């Protein structure tokens, strides 16, 4: 059975059982900025599972395109790993649970092929259930599985969870016995090569708390609603039904591999009989080509284009690995024009848009190959020379400088250098490479600071520094002082005068102004020089040792050599200092609760507020966040002395002062300690005692990237004002609801529940209105070239799922033996949309819903051959869309 047919049967089975067919989300994880790609079938439904949004349907089915990026380096080395895959899934949002999910899965798996099922032998299916899930065990018994083929497994294998806190619950997996030629008998506990897992049914019913690993966490209670999330790997099922060993042998992948073998003159599996080798370089490279070309096709098809960052870099890396692999197999010409059309033909049965959009996809793919071949030619020559020189010198590692030159000058990726060196039995000085990269980033950071001050060229700053030496910062001890103007930058020349209205950069010999750095915002204030005065707008350190004041001349003029009086905004300084000390306390307290891995990844110390980024593998539970906040404020109440002192780096480490990962420190460092509570290396300004902070209020905790979390908080009077506003709000709500303050939350929840119930009732009424005329419309179907055609506009206000439901309802009321096409147009928000539904009898005559929609929308729109939709035209075009579909049928 072909992969596309398995896909179709899966969707049809669940659609027939009341599930809405939901199209795959695009591969880029657009809805989650913390992820590059969708990696699971349930990701587009996460807001529904978490209760953040109300699902527009109670049950859904989809085939989701997924990408697994951690496997890139393993792809090809075994026949088990691939990057792109498809995940069949059926989902319930508070509708059905185990008693329906298990029979639905069993029915599709075991129903004969000629009856629309997958035709698996029921005697070869082994379900697993969670240890104490007697309910699931009994349901499996009720569908006919003998007790000795139902395996109970522990939390690590059969209990699923997502997020902390988050939903969790037991799961039940279905394994298929591939036969004695694949291993020992005895079920999945004995041999998971012979017994292949092909479907996982997750029963979400509990909420989990914080913990470590797959087993060590508490169950906090029941979820408000029980949900179902299942996943069947489409490629895995295809390998079972097609009687092949792995995904590289199925019909959507093997033709690409075969084409690569044809081009290179290699035979897949030639080195180990009829079965492909797991380790022979030829078979490894053929698998790399097959997987990566298919993945590149799907990524570009979903809008990703090659680049040097994010998703585009993943695509570039995948394409370059495929291109280099086929060149190592002996093919020296352009490979993408030969391979990409084969991948398109393999995948377009399920994704017809790949065929219609192939011109654009090919343009990007072919251009990327051309660019890489140029890079490869230049870089390979340099690398070959480096390899030869390394061997001649008797060394085992290519220098970091050479790897950096390849990367920086020739655009040769470091991962490719590492891979080629490994193939030649050599290593690469990765530490030296990283050090040179860090130096380059530091230079880029300095240039960015210079651009912020308006000077891309740092030479003027270096000249001032060389002529007068470093600027002395006195801001730790004083907030104002007499200073001499050393340079005026941004005027006609470094030694010219700045006049009223000009914005320039001033360099003083000494200054109390703190330059932005270490997450702390700069001081602001005024400088009075003779009869003139300037307002300091920003303070930066574009090159180490030189403090530059960006300032606007308010009156008079400022000349080099004049003596003036520099005075910072003390209210701002005190507010920033409070925030900075608070950040130290938050950092230490996070480590107290989360462990030493909770290291700082970034910060912002601004007047009255702070932002603290830290590394941690998991989120922070609300209860932990409350404890952190309480402990921080207890440190304020203790009124601990804040002390700063300079010592050696070795001594600072000995006394346990925290240093920021990646920062460079000199031999002498400044340590800031808050009593015995917190101790860090820090160059910022702080309060004298912790009690001066007044109050710290944590506002939020969120993810800003993989393994990086962010806490935001208010400090001092800003925290007090926030709580005062919150108090007034609660008091106002209590007054409106006429209840005590501690009952406001309960009353709000009741109101929200009532609103949701009312929305559900409105949804039911709207559905009744929309579907009420389905029977009459079906009875009025016209005849177009032997096809029953219904073209109608949906009732006013109907949109989205309502229109799809109406089209399917009309289709279901037409005699299934009669070819039928239903087109329903709708008008909403000034736009016209169209849903087309086609029954199997019409499909057998070559009619496709997706094709008809593309005709109506000039190539746009999408969906399956049975159900498709499009939109975006002006509302007045709705009748014309119906006529276009009718004309397309007439001309078919």
Swiss-Prot record:
It holds the Pfam family tRNA_SAD. The lineage of its organism: Bacteria, Bacillati, Actinomycetota, Actinomycetes, Micromonosporales. CDD domains: AlaRS_core. Its cofactor is Zn(2+). Belongs to the class-II aminoacyl-tRNA synthetase family. This is Alanine--tRNA ligase. It comes from Salinispora tropica (strain ATCC BAA-916 / DSM 44818 / JCM 13857 / NBRC 105044 / CNB-440). It is an enzyme of class 6 (ligase). Keywords: Aminoacyl-tRNA synthetase, ATP-binding, Cytoplasm, Ligase, Metal-binding, Nucleotide-binding, Protein biosynthesis, RNA-binding, tRNA-binding, Zinc.
């Amino acid at each position: 059975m072909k992969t596309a047919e398995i896909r179709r049967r899966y969707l049809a089975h669940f659609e027939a059982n009341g599930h809405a067919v939901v199209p795959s989300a695009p591969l880029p994880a657009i809805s989650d900025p913390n992820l590059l790609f969708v990696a699971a079938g349930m990701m587009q439904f996460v807001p529904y599972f978490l209760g953040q949004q109300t699902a527009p349907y109670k049950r859904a089915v989809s085939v989701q395109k997924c990408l697994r990026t951690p496997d890139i380096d393993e792809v090809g080395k075994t026949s088990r790993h691939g990057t792109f895959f498809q995940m069949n899934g059926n989902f319930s949002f508070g509708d059905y649970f185990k008693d329906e999910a298990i029979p639905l899965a069993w029915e599709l798996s075991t129903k004969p092929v000629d009856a629309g099922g997958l035709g698996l032998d029921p005697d070869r299916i082994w379900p697993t259930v969670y240890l104490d899930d007697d309910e699931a065990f009994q349901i499996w018994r009720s569908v006919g599985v003998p007790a000795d083929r139902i395996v109970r497994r522990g939390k690590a294998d059969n209990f699923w969870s997502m997020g902390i806190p988050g939903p969790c619950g037991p799961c039940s997996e279905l394994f298929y016995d591939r036969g004695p030629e694949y291993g020992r008998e005895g079920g999945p506990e004995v041999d998971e090569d012979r017994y292949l897992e092909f479907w996982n049914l997750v029963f979400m019913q509990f909420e989990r708390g914080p913990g470590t690993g797959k087993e060590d966490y508490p169950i906090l209670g029941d979820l408000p609603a029980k949900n179902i999330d299942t996943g069947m790997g489409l490629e895995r099922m295809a390998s079972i039904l097609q009687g092949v060993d792995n995904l590289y042998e199925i019909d959507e992948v093997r033709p690409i591999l075969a084409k690569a073998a044809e081009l290179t003159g290699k035979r897949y599996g030639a080195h180990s009989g009829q079965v492909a080798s797991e380790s022979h370089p030829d078979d490894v490279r053929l698998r790399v080509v097959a997987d990566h070309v298919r993945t590149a096709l799907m990524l570009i098809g979903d809008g990703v284009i090659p680049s040097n960052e994010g998703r585009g870099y993943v695509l570039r890396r995948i394409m370059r690995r495929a291109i280099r692999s086929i060149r190592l197999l002996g093919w020296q010409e352009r490979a993408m024009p030969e391979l990409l059309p084969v991948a398109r033909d393999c995948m377009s049965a399920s994704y017809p848009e790949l065929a219609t959009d192939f011109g654009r996809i090919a343009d990007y793919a072919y251009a990327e190959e051309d660019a890489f071949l140029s890079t490869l030619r230049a870089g390979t020559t340099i690398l070959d020379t480096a390899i030869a020189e390394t061997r001649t010198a008797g060394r085992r590692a290519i220098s970091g400088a050479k790897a950096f030159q390849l990367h920086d000058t020739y655009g040769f990726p470091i991962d490719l250098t590492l891979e080629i060196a490994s193939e030649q039995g050599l290593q690469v000085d990765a530490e030296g490479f990283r050090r040179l990269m860090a130096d380059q980033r530091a230079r880029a950071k300095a240039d960015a600071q210079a651009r912020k001050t308006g000077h891309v060229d740092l030479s003027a700053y270096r000249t001032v520094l060389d002529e007068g030496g470093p600027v002395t910062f006195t801001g730790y001890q004083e907030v104002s002082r007499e200073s001499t103007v050393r340079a005026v930058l941004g005027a006609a020349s470094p030694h010219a005068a700045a006049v009223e209205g000009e914005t320039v950069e001033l360099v003083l010999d000494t200054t109390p102004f703190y330059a932005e750095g270490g997450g702390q915002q700069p001081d602001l204030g005024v400088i009075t020089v003779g009869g003139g005065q300037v307002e300091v707008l920003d303070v930066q350190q574009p090159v180490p040792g030189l403090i530059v004041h960006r300032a606007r001349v308010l009156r008079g003029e400022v000349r080099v050599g004049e003596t003036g009086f520099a005075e910072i905004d003390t209210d701002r300084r005190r507010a920033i200092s409070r925030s900075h000390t608070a950040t130290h306390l938050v950092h230490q307290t996070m480590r107290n609760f989360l462990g030493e891995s909770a290291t700082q990844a970034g910060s912002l110390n601004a007047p009255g507020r702070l932002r603290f980024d830290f590394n941690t593998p998991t989120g922070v539970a609300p209860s932990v966040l409350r404890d952190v906040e309480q402990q921080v404020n207890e440190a304020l109440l203790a009124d601990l002395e804040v002390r700063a002192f300079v010592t050696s780096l070795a001594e600072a480490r000995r006394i346990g002062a925290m240093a920021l990962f990646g920062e460079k420190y000199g031999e002498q460092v400044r340590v800031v300690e808050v009593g015995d509570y917190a101790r860090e290396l820090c160059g910022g300004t702080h309060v004298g005692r912790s009690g001066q902070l007044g109050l710290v209020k944590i506002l939020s905790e969120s993810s800003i990237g993989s393994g990086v979390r962010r806490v935001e908080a208010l400090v001092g009077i800003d925290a007090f004002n926030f709580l005062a506003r919150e108090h007034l709000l609660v008091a106002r709500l209590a007054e409106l609801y006429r209840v005590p303050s501690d009952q406001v939350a309960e009353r709000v929840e009741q109101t929200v529940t009532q609103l949701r119930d009312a929305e559900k009732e409105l949804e039911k009424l709207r559905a009744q209105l929309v579907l009420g005329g389905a029977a009459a419309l079906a009875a009025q179907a016209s005849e177009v070239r032997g096809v029953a055609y219904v073209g109608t506009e949906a009732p006013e206000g109907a949109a989205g799922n309502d229109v799809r439901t109406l089209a399917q309802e009309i289709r279901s009321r037409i005699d299934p033996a009669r070819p039928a096409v239903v087109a329903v147009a709708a008008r909403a928000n000034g736009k016209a949309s169209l849903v087309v539904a086609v029954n199997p009898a019409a499909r057998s005559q070559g009619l496709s819903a997706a094709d008809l929609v593309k005709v109506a929308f000039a190539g746009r729109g999408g969906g399956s051959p049975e159900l498709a939709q499009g939109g975006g035209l002006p509302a007045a075009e709705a009748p014309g869309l119906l006529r276009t579909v009718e004309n397309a049928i007439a001309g078919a």
